[in-house]
């Protein structure tokens, strides 16, 4: 007997934060809807979708990370910054690399393009930074009537975003004061140096709780009897009947059997590389599919606060600082086109002398993220003659930095040194440019557009052009070049799509009720 339903109202492919947002909004606005969520990876945390940082036991947390690494579960991952600087091509714990096709001859490629396969997706492993986009990062056609800010606020509600979880971190005010002196002049109030908005909260006992898909699901989804979550389930294609999405074909990875689930609506939220893969495998191939792929070049540097003393007391769950204690934000602006994520650390990423002890929180890790110069030629393509470890069309990344990209990266290197000197004493000889793909913020591959002009995959409600009933979700929907962490924006766009489905479900139900009443009469 199949563990899948034969028919539902909505199928959601993928269980990351955006897939969870669809489930949450539909549970709130269409409580009678039958929803099936399908995830290729296993359940690695409790409740399902919870962030692995919330797992207290180190060994159990490590097992959860390994189980998230899909077909590369036993492959070595990065354990320290030195491995990256030494040129080792490794994924972070909880993720796995695209093993082939990540770069083509004469191109830059994305050498560390990575995935996570688990309930919660990368939302079980992320840094939880949730800044709002600014200036050219914003989506103009959603800004005209003020829709974007309301959607971002709703995204913050679903993700549980706060800005005060690290208020007790030592020296964070000093770090922000020194950064502000360098960059705040002539900036509007909302784009000045400030605390980083994070999807994290501190419990009454002092312990930090990091948001994953479990927080986005919320109690309303978990209590929804019409909602079901199926892990270890590979969606191989979206079914289309009479030009409209009509369901999915799914392979049960536990026994290898294939099943079909009929649905009124299908939402593909598989990530920015696998969502276009599912559409391609389904024969749904709009001109912009997989194109406008963009990552954020990432430059890192470290400095040390020298003129500080260890605080008399240290607040927190067990008295220890988290590695992200004192997270500060230098917002993107068009004049300074970088997103700055500044983290205070307990330990130095650079070896220090044995007789030079580190004051907790005095090591400052600076990271600047650069927005990509968008071009249609940057894309993930698919090879119908070859398959990946899951049996899906093999990916081929085409990705090239433009002259403008290289100029922005050089400017970012100068800027991060300036900021590092402003904060304290630099620990690095020079800035380090992370391998392309390191940000994990891949965007644009199923991008949203205001018109069906061949330059976008979906409409402003995330519905795929020309395929009614098929919606896409995730960072790939974002149509602008962003430098900030994209999760909040992606969840905000998912909220809009979910509302549209809820409206249609309500309208269809009302029509069916009227039709039934007329027939009975």
Tell me what each language-model feature is.
Residues 63, 73-82, 88-92, 106-108, ...:
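Conserved redox-cofactor binding core of oxidoreductases
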Residues 16-17, 273, 477:
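Residue-level detector of alpha-helix initiation sites
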Residues 194-199, 230-231, 236-241, 407-481, ...:
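A glycine-rich dinucleotide-binding beta-alpha-beta segment and adjacent secondary-structure elements
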Residues 10-37:
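N-terminal Rossmann-like FAD-binding beta1-loop-alpha1 element of flavoenzymes
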Residues 480-501:
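A conserved FAD-binding loop/helix module that cradles the flavin
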Residues 42-75, 79, 114-128:
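Conserved N-terminal glycine-rich FAD pyrophosphate-binding loop of Rossmann-like flavoproteins
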Residues 90-115, 119-122, 286-406, 439-444, ...:
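FAD cofactor-binding and catalytic pocket of flavoenzymes
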Residues 28-60, 64, 238, 249-318, ...:
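Glycine-rich loop(s) and the adjacent beta-strand/alpha-helix scaffold that form part
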């Amino acid at each position: 007997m199949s563990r899948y339903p034969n028919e539902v109202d909505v199928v959601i492919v993928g269980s990351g934060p955006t897939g969870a947002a669809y489930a949450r909004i539909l549970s709130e606005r269409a409580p009678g809807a039958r929803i099936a969520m399908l995830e290729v990876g296993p359940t690695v945390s409790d409740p399902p979708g919870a962030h692995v940082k919330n797992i207290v036991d180190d060994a159990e947390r490590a097992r959860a990370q390994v189980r998230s690494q899909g077909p590369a579960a036993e492959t070595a991952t990065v354990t320290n910054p030195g491995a990256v600087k030494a040129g080792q091509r490794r994924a972070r714990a909880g993720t796995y690399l695209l093993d082939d096709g990540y770069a083509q001859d004469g191109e830059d490629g994305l050498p560390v393009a990575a995935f996570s396969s688990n309930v919660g997706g990368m939302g079980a492993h992320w840094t939880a930074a949730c800044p709002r986009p600014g200036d050219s990062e914003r989506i103009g056609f959603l800004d005209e009537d003020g829709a974007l800010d309301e959607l971002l606020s709703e995204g913050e509600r679903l993700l549980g975003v706060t800005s005060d979880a690290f208020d007790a971190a030592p020296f964070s005010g000093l770090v922000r004061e020194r950064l502000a002196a360098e960059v705040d002049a002539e900036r509007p109030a909302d784009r000045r140096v400030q605390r980083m908005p994070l999807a994290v909260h501190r419990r009454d006992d002092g312990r930090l709780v990091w948001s994953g898909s479990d927080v986005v699901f919320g109690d309303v989804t978990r209590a929804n009897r019409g909602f079901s979550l199926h892990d270890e389930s590979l969606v191989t294609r979206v079914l289309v009947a009479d030009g409209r999405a009509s369901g999915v074909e799914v392979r049960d990875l536990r026994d290898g059997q294939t099943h079909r689930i009929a649905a009124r609506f299908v939402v593909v939220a598989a990530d920015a590389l696998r969502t276009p893969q599912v559409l391609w495998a389904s024969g749904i191939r709009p001109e912009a599919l997989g194109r406008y792929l963009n990552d954020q070049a990432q430059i890192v540097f470290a400095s040390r606060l020298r003129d500080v003393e260890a605080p008399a007391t240290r607040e927190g769950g067990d008295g220890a600082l988290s590695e992200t204690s004192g997270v500060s934000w230098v917002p993107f602006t068009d004049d300074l086109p970088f997103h700055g994520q500044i983290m205070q650390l307990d330990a130095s990423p650079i070896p220090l002398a044995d007789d030079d002890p580190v004051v907790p929180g005095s090591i400052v890790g600076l990271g600047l993220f650069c927005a990509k110069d968008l071009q249609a030629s940057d894309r993930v393509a698919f090879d119908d003659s070859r398959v990946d470890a899951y049996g899906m069309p093999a990916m081929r990344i085409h990705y090239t930095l433009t002259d403008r990209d290289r100029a922005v990266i050089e400017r970012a290197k100068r800027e991060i040194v300036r900021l590092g000197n402003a904060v304290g004493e630099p620990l690095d000889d020079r800035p380090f440019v992370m391998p392309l793909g390191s940000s994990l913020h891949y965007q644009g591959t199923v991008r949203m557009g205001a018109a069906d002009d061949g330059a976008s995959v979906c409409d402003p409600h995330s519905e795929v052009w020309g395929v009614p009933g098929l919606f896409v979700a995730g960072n790939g929907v974002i149509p602008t070049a962003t430098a900030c962490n994209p999760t909040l924006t992606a969840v905000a766009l998912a909220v809009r799509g979910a509302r549209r489905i809820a409206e249609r479900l309500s309208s269809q139900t009302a029509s069916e009720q009227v039709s039934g009443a007329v027939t009975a009469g």
